[in-house]
Amino acid sequence: MVRLFYFILLNFLILNFTNAKDISIGENLNLEFICELEKKIIKNSEYNYKTFLAEELNIKNLDSFQIYSNKPSTLMVNGLSKFLSQNSNLDVKIVNKDVVLFKAFNNEKTYSESAIITRKSGELIHEITKNINTDNSEKDISIYICKNKSKNA
């Protein structure tokens, strides 16, 4: 039930911030997590939001997922995906005492990645959307449980 709430919250926040650049960095962070994949939800031409447990997939866990933020506007993420690690222009950057939320688009606005991590529970939801604004858009939603390797949580 909690996961469903965060999934709905993530989609709500993403939909509300799609057309605007939103930056709210309220915390200075330097965090590193080890994250274990719990499940993946896939929506494409073959699957309509089908859920796969981690044991059913051949996907590596995240050995080093890093978040760095510095007030008022710096947020960098590394280790979640190549796209996010190489993208310094995140469209949405929100950091507060409870969550870290971020989203980035490619230049053509046909591909996006977003994620939200709840700092207290360590739950991470990572969403990849391909073919945005087409009839055959695809979503890949990964849900991880993360453990903090750093002390400044």
How does the language model describe each region?
Residues 1-25:
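Classical Sec-dependent N-terminal signal peptides that target proteins to the secretory pathway
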Residues 24-49, 146:
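Tryptophan-anchored aromatic micro-motifs
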